[in-house]
Design a protein with these regions (language model features):
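Helix-terminus/linker motif at the lipid-water interface of multi-pass membrane proteins
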Residues: 56-63, 119-130, 187, 191-224, ...
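Small-residue-rich hydrophobic transmembrane alpha-helices
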Residues: 1-46, 83-102, 214-278, 310-332
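Juxtamembrane/interfacial segments around transmembrane helices
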Residues: 10, 86-91, 160-167, 189-197, ...
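Short alpha-helical transmembrane segments in multi-pass integral membrane proteins
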Residues: 14-81, 127-184, 240-305, 348-388
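A gly/Pro-rich, aromatic-decorated transmembrane alpha-helix motif that marks the paired
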Residues: 115-119, 342-346
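Short runs within selected transmembrane alpha-helices of multi-pass transporters and secretion channels
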Residues: 7, 11, 76-95, 102-113, ...
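Transmembrane helical elements of multi-pass membrane transporters/channels
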Residues: 75, 86, 109, 142-146, ...
Length: 388
């Protein structure tokens, strides 16, 4: 999440400066973001290496889980630096209209991870059976593959575009203070959102094994669907950001509406498909029929809310942020998560004594608040700001 905040700011600045043909400022944005990403990921690597048990102890008191998780945590921590570099370089590539490279790298990394998980976890084709340690090694290697693929693509694209990399940490159009003002709200927002997710997970854990199993069962398909449509958020940030960099304000607003419409149609189509196939998906799992039924209902609820979630991603994660106003999104996220979502979650679970379906349905209504406020901000156009 923290690395995502750095790459988000990198994307905002690079898109605007490339749109304004301020090449030096674009490279400066890249350099500053890369250094920030390296420092932050190195600190997380150090923390994971020195205090793995203490960190995992915040989530569980089961020593067997902590000991096993520490093995995984120590290895996976080495993927933080490659992940940071990959994300920031990917931001540059997307802003330079080479989004295919990060896409192919992601597909390749998933393929490498899947194959290595099979080989190392279960000890196939002569490899030792490593269990969770094998899963960690597979993830680390897949991240290294991702970095190498993106790095090669980055070099080739620079040559193709005739770009000359510029090493500079000194902005002319903005200051380091402006950079920090943009990044700090995102860091705070992402941290509090992650904390909120942990609170929600803790609540789900207290609902009983069947309820938790049903929610866990839906995780992969939710992640796949949101991941597939999240590209619209990244595209919105780049396309609208370039317009703002060129001071094409009306065009930026019009393009934003087109992207929002595309996201709504795409999400609605995928949601309809998910509702139709929800029973088929849960049928693949060898679990109790009660768990399958709960999982199916949860998928339907998720599908109904998905268009709202996608619109929030496009607006909050792409369009409104493209003008550099990250503070307003932080406020929306904090109110949505901590003033609406978490209280409703606790109310449904501990006061109403509802099961997972009721808790999840009530919790997710906070997405409606986010959308309503984001649309008001969007229509007022105060987010339309050129940093150039």
């Amino acid at each position: 999440m923290v690395i995502g905040a750095v790459s988000t700011v990198a994307g905002i600045l690079i898109a605007q400066f490339i749109g304004a043909q301020e090449t030096k400022e674009a490279w400066c944005s890249f350099d500053v973001s890369l250094i920030c990403g390296l420092i932050i990921s190195a600190l997380f690597l150090l923390a994971a290496g020195v205090f793995p048990s203490q960190i995992l102890g915040l989530y569980t008191k089961d020593m067997s889980i902590i000991n096993t998780g520490s093995v995984y945590f120590k290895i996976i921590a080495f993927s933080y630096i490659p992940m940071a570099v990959s994300n920031i370089v990917s931001s540059w590539l997307r802003c330079k209209e080479h989004a295919t490279i990060p896409l192919l790298a992601s597909f390749g990394a998933v393929a490498v991870n899947t194959v290595l998980n099979y080989l190392l976890i279960f000890g196939k084709f002569g490899f030792s059976c490593m269990g969770i340690k094998g899963a960690a090694i597979a993830t680390l290697i897949s991240q290294l593959f991702n970095l190498v693929f993106i790095g090669i693509g980055f070099v080739l694209c620079i040559r193709k575009d005739g770009d000359q990399p510029i090493l500079s940490l000194h902005f002319k159009k903005i200051t380091i203070r402006d950079y920090l003002i943009m990044i700090l709200p995102i860091l705070i927002s992402e941290f509090l959102w992650s904390l909120g997710q942990n609170v929600e997970s803790a609540v789900y854990g207290h609902l009983g094994t069947s309820n938790l199993a049903a929610y866990t069962l839906t995780g992969p398909i939710q992640g796949l669907m949101i991941g597939a449509l999240s590209g619209l958020s990244a595209a919105a940030g780049v396309m609208v950001g370039k317009r703002l960099g060129r001071k094409e304000y009306d065009e930026a607003y019009t393009e934003s509406k087109k992207i929002m419409c595309a996201g709504l149609v795409g999400a609605a189509a995928v949601s309809a498909l998910l509702i139709l196939l929800s029973g088929v998906y849960t049928g693949f799992y060898r679990v109790d029929d009660n768990v399958k039924e709960l999982g199916k209902i949860l998928l339907i609820v998720f599908a109904l809310y998905a268009p709202v979630k996608v619109e929030n991603m496009i607006l909050g994660g792409g369009i409104i942020r493209s003008g550099g106003n990250t503070k307003i999104i932080m406020i929306i996220d904090i109110i949505g998560t901590w003033c609406i979502g978490i209280p409703l979650c606790l109310l449904a679970a501990y006061v109403f004594k509802w099961g997972i379906v009721g808790v999840y349905t009530l919790l997710t209504t906070e997405e409606l608040f986010r959308l309503a406020v984001s649309l008001i901000i969007f229509r007022r156009r105060k987010w339309i700001i050129s940093l150039c």
